[in-house]
Amino acid sequence: MSRHSNTPATDASVLLVQLSDSHLFAEDGARLLGMDTAHSLEKVVERVAREQPRIDLILATGDVSQDGSLDSYTRFRRLSAPLAAPLRWFAGNHDEREPMQRATEGSDLLEQIVDVGNWRVVLLDSSIPGAVPGYLEDDQLDLLRRAIDSAGERFLLVSFHHHPVPIGSDWMDPIGLRNPQALFDLLAPYPQLRCLLWGHIHQEFDRQRGPLRLLASPSTCVQFAPGSSDFTLDRLAPGYRWLRLHDDGRLETGISRVDDVVFEVDYDTAGY
């Protein structure tokens, strides 16, 4: 069953921050492809705190954990706490639902519908336990339909982990959302739908599909090279996406990356 809350906006617009694909571990100093993922998240959070003094909602868009441990999820909560803003998260293909739920107890972290300002944010679980690609099950599509139908005059942003459109990377496109047409068919009659936001691809993505803005964010750790045929790491730094959602339905967004730290990365790795 989905939960639903109203989060007061700070002014006539809404400021969201997307933190994606942090790939945290239980152990201090653990590394993914040579990068200390807790250290990189900490530096991204420090940058967010400097650049975004008032945040209405933080979205952690999947792959919060690399090892699926309870400690990795509590680590994320601890490292993101300095931002002092409402946080919601959902699972990616590397996450484990049971520890993620345990880390959520006593909070609204897994809440799937959040009304903030003149917008409704709907968060869906596209993960398939034990698999890399994604799929939106009927219960998630039904939740989305109900959320849209009950949104009134609000504009909508919908977020999940897996990419619903090709991104031009031969190795990544087969591991995106397996049933994107079901999603787009559901969304087609609703002009108040303004944005789809996802993670998974570890790179910036910004396209338009009719009235829909299609957006993805860099990872807070390692980056994947756009347009690559095989697994390839990019040399861009970790970062985050900010989104300003205006009451009239306009959306402004941008990417910011850590530019004052040199991170150690194993660029010769052929996968993970």
UniProtKB/Swiss-Prot annotation:
Gene3D superfamilies: 3.60.21.10
Binding positions (AMP): H23, D63, N93, H94, H202
Catalysed reactions, as listed in the record: 3',5'-cyclic AMP + H2O = AMP + H(+)
Regulation: Activated by iron. Other divalent metal ions have no effect.
InterPro entries linked: Calcineurin-like_PHP_ApaH, CNP_phosphodiesterase-III, GpdQ/CpdA-like, Metallo-depent_PP-like
Result, substituting H23A: Loss of activity
Binding site for Fe cation 2: D63, N93, H161, H200
Protein name: 3',5'-cyclic adenosine monophosphate phosphodiesterase CpdA
